[in-house]
């Protein structure tokens, strides 16, 4: 299989800019249920990358209409490619599957599936991030998503399960330990609380930096000194 992403990767030290992909990387984010935080996390990732010098495009792949609502509230208008520019973040809302838009070639595309994780079947994204709550009543939704997305978890270059608002050491409830053994390709991460995805604060920035470096490593990157892009 031909690799889709070739990388020039920076050393993962604090204060340095994140690595830049030589070709486009696709990141898919989905939540186990409404309120799991998929949109929050997808926006935060896209804003972090754009703010760090990596061209990123947030793509709304769910039918919630949240992005157009936010753009209207902020009084924004889309450009010729249907993209809104929000606080340094490029956002393309859901226009439907029959609408043809001007093609774009960002370094990273972040696809937000919301809780419509079934739409991810067969999409073949490079990096898969699954957002989940950690309350006991959310367990069944999480198990259902993991079971259904098994092929995607195994075929992605990198797969992550992000628990919302939990510290390291939390292992989930019920069968999560067993699921982790079942999906050895999946890494469990812990997302700190930050209210605004476009302003995650110092703790949020550190989390996003760590997540991005892990994604780069999963996609085949190697720590090396910075080189000028050709």
Please identify what each model-predicted range represents:
Residues 199-230:
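NTP-binding/hydrolysis catalytic cores, primarily Walker-type P-loop NTPases
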Residues 46, 50:
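Gly/Ala-rich phosphate-binding loop of Rossmann-like dinucleotide-binding domains
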Residues 41:
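Hydrophobic positions on the alpha1 helix immediately C-terminal to the Walker A/P-loop
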Residues 25-36, 55-124, 189, 193-202:
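P-loop/Walker-type NTP enzyme "switch/lid" segment
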Residues 4, 105-202:
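Conserved catalytic-core segment of NTP-binding enzymes
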Residues 2-6, 97-99, 142-149, 204-207, ...:
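Generic hydrophobic alpha-helical segments
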Residues 1-26:
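Extreme N-terminal, non-catalytic leader segments
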Residues 9-13, 52, 152, 218, ...:
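Solvent-exposed amphipathic alpha-helical surface segments
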């Amino acid at each position: 299989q031909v690799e889709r992403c070739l990388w020039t990767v920076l050393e993962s030290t604090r204060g340095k800019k994140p690595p830049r992909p030589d070709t486009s990387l696709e990141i898919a984010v989905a939540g186990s249920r409404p309120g799991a935080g998929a949109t929050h996390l997808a926006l935060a990732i896209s804003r972090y990358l754009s703010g760090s010098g990596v061209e990123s495009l947030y793509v709304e792949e769910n039918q919630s209409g949240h992005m157009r609502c936010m753009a209207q509230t902020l009084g924004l208008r889309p450009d010729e490619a249907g993209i809104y520019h929000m606080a340094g973040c490029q956002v393309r809302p859901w226009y439907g599957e029959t609408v043809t838009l001007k093609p774009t070639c960002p370094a990273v595309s972040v696809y937000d599936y919301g809780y419509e994780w079934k739409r991810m079947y067969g999409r073949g994204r490079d990096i898969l991030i699954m957002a989940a709550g950690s309350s006991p009543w959310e367990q069944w939704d999480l198990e259902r998503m993991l079971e259904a997305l098994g092929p995607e978890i195994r075929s992605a270059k990198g797969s992550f399960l992000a628990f919302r608002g939990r510290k390291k050491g939390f292992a989930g409830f019920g069968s999560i330990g067993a699921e982790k053994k079942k999906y050895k390709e999946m890494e469990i991460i812990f997302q700190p609380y930050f209210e605004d995805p476009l302003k995650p604060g110092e703790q949020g920035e550190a989390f996003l930096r760590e997540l991005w470096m892990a994604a780069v490593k999963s996609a085949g990157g190697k720590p090396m000194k910075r080189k000028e892009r050709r």
